[in-house]
Swiss-Prot record:
A motif (DEAD box) lies at residues 269-272. Keywords: ATP-binding, Helicase, Hydrolase, Nucleotide-binding, Nucleus, Ribosome biogenesis, RNA-binding, rRNA processing. GO terms for biological process: endonucleolytic cleavage in 5'-ETS of tricistronic rRNA transcript (SSU-rRNA, 5.8S rRNA, LSU-rRNA); endonucleolytic cleavage in ITS1 to separate SSU-rRNA from 5.8S rRNA and LSU-rRNA from tricistronic rRNA transcript (SSU-rRNA, 5.8S rRNA, LSU-rRNA); endonucleolytic cleavage to generate mature 5'-end of SSU-rRNA from (SSU-rRNA, 5.8S rRNA, LSU-rRNA); snoRNA localization. This is ATP-dependent RNA helicase ROK1. Signal peptide: none annotated. The keyword Nucleotide-binding applies. It comes from Debaryomyces hansenii (strain ATCC 36239 / CBS 767 / BCRC 21394 / JCM 1990 / NBRC 0083 / IGC 2968) (Yeast). Its main location: nucleus. Its EC number is 3.6.4.13. The keyword Cell cycle does not apply. InterPro entries: DDX52/Rok1_DEADc, DEAD/DEAH_box_helicase_dom, DEAD_box_RNA_helicase, Helicase_ATP-bd, Helicase_C-like, P-loop_NTPase, RNA_helicase_DEAD_Q_motif. The gene is ROK1. Residues 53-83, 503-550 are annotated as: Disordered. It catalyses: ATP + H2O = ADP + phosphate + H(+). Pfam families: DEAD, Helicase_C.
Length: 550
């Protein structure tokens, strides 16, 4: 059997004869049994190299049991964990590194089956969870689901890729299923707000999976749906749950084509962004239109600064606060590294060195601070014959969706982007995140590198910095320390002075002015400029000559 052919199937990676770099496929060390018979090798390897799990794979449990002749003992199936006492809860929270504060805190759950006995979880909802491959809850789900099902307001902070979306979708769907008024076009009862269209689409896809087989109307307020609602082609009251970005929803509210008066469950995802400048007024307007006296609010994010938390607390009723790990720490599955490149030219050289040394293992996401710089790096890496594309705010939603789809399917190996996809968008198999430009805050850093190391899988994040980044890099070091990644930076960086509040604000508000991305020598640039000037001068002389002739 041709092993290389098998290894190259699952991810659909397009290869070129011109590419000589050794792009390593993902490691096989996680295989349960390397001695499986030849007929099982294909399916196992296909699953390994299917970076983003876009294909359905059957369980290998039975096959492993039959073929693992060297194993004398097979582990007994562990019964679902149930939490029935404060002592059980304390042990679980210690294990999960969960910090929970508030009055009358419900016990966490130890398994999804635990929800059946305690909250009569809808059987079809549980079946949909299992069919989607969700067999046991994550730490944030352990806490957030019972808190929400008890009808309590919630502020939740957990690392990127830790399952926050399911943590609010499961109780949202369950609550609405239980409170079905059996009235046609009753009105929107569940509302989910997210800062970006990409994240809204992803949430809607998860919601669609959870509600499969149930008589529940769900919608995402896309441009097309908003137009139909605003033109009264569709009645918005038909929807039980609506997912939307703030501005589009506000536009429909002002047109009086969407009413939020029946909303019982409000979820604000990426709370730190939606309570930040530029979004906070929109968020406040949405909240003012949610007039139901029984309204329950949930707020989720990977980072929640103190100022944002204070604002959130002020609009909530007796909330419970859940922190998994540290408030501004990255997932412990991400290996973080700071690389000093000296100057801007050194960044491109650093990428090319990573390629030569075999550290450039796709899929990869590269973040830059501006659209102009993202475009420039895209063209530079195209010259290196890399399988690369770029996504930014100037591209249409349709173009961005297509690029994301191609990246997930493996047609694109390297995705260059701005912060437009830094939040929430789930790429399950990203091996490496490169911060070509240092992010302007600890929150932005955590969200960027959170595109890797998701769902408990290992990932790596590399951040390039120059002499101009002396202030911007300090918050990054603090996140790395909280995440246990002290080995990822040089010791002399510890001696940098602590930033004042004003310095932090200044770094966050003002982008560092950087040189143009290019490795073209200075003398070549001068020659190009001289040539362009000569061409322009020739054109002017020709135009003047034509004018004189006339």
């Amino acid at each position: 059997m041709d092993i290389f052919r098998i290894l190259s199937r699952g991810a659909s990676l397009k290869k070129s004869k011109d590419i000589t770099t050794d792009y390593a496929v993902p490691s096989r060390k996680q295989f349960v049994n390397e001695k499986q018979k030849e007929e099982n090798l294909k399916s196992v390897v296909d699953k390994e190299v299917d970076f983003f799990h876009t294909k359905k794979h059957t369980s290998h449990k039975e096959t492993e049991k039959k073929n693992d002749e060297g194993e004398d003992e097979i582990e007994d199936e562990v019964p679902p964990l149930t939490i029935s006492s404060d002592d059980d809860a304390r042990k679980l929270r210690k294990l999960n590194k969960s910090k929970v504060s508030g009055e009358d805190i419900p016990l966490p759950i130890g398994s999804f089956e635990d929800l059946i006995g305690r909250y009569k979880l809808d059987k079809k909802l549980l079946s949909n969870l299992i069919d989607a491959g969700f067999t046991e809850p994550t730490p944030i789900q352990d806490e957030a689901i019972p808190i929400s099902l008890e009808g309590r307001d919630l502020i939740a902070c957990a690392p990127t890729g830790s399952g926050k979306t399911l943590a609010f979708l499961i109780p949202l769907v369950q609550t609405i299923l239980q409170s079905n008024p059996n009235v046609k076009n009753y009105g929107i009862r569940g509302l989910i707000i997210s800062p970006t269209n990409e994240l809204a689409v992803q949430i809607f896809q998860e919601l669609n999976t959870m509600t499969k087989g149930k008589k529940m109307k769900i919608g995402i307020l896309s441009k097309q749906l908003a137009n139909k609602i605003n033109n009264k082609i569709i009645n918005s009251s038909k929807y039980d749950i609506l997912v939307s970005t703030p501005l589009r929803l506000i536009d429909s509210i002002k047109n009086e084509t969407i009413s939020l008066s029946k909303v019982e469950q409000l979820v604000i995802d990426e709370t730190d962004k939606l309570f930040d400048q530029g979004f906070v007024e929109q968020t406040d307007e949405i909240l003012s239109n949610c007039t139901n006296t029984k309204l329950r609010k949930s707020m989720f994010s990977a980072t929640i600064p103190s100022g944002v938390e204070e604002m959130a607390q002020s609009i909530m009723k007796d909330p419970i606060r859940v922190i998994i790990g540290h408030k501004e720490a990255a997932s412990n599955t991400i290996e973080q590294k700071l690389v000093f490149t000296g100057n801007e030219e050194g960044k491109l050289l650093a990428i090319r060195q990573m390629i030569q040394q075999g550290e450039f293992k796709p899929p990869i996401i590269i973040f830059l601070q501006s659209i102009t710089r993202a475009k420039a790096l895209f063209h530079e890496l195209l010259y290196d014959r890399l399988n690369v594309d770029v996504i930014h705010a100037e591209r249409t939603p349709k173009q961005r969706d297509e690029v994301i789809k191609r990246f997930k399917s493996g047609d694109i190996w390297v995705l260059i982007t701005t912060d437009v996809i830094a939040r929430g968008v789930d790429f399950k198999g990203v091996n490496l995140v490169i911060n070509y430009d240092v992010p302007q805050s600890a929150q932005a850093y955590v969200h960027r590198i959170g595109r890797t190391g998701r769902g408990g899988k290992a990932g790596k994040a590399v951040t390039f910095f120059t002499k101009e980044d002396d202030k911007a890099v300090k918050p990054i070091i603090n996140v790395m320390k909280q995440s246990g990644c002290e080995s990822g930076y040089s010791g002399w960086l510890e001696d940098m002075h602590k930033l004042s509040k004003n310095e932090k604000k200044d770094v966050k508000k003002h982008e560092i002015k950087r040189k143009q991305i290019s490795t073209v020598p200075k003398i070549m640039k001068q020659k190009r400029k001289q040539r362009e000037e000569m061409i322009d001068a020739s054109k002017r002389r020709k135009q003047e000559s034509q004018s004189n002739t006339e």
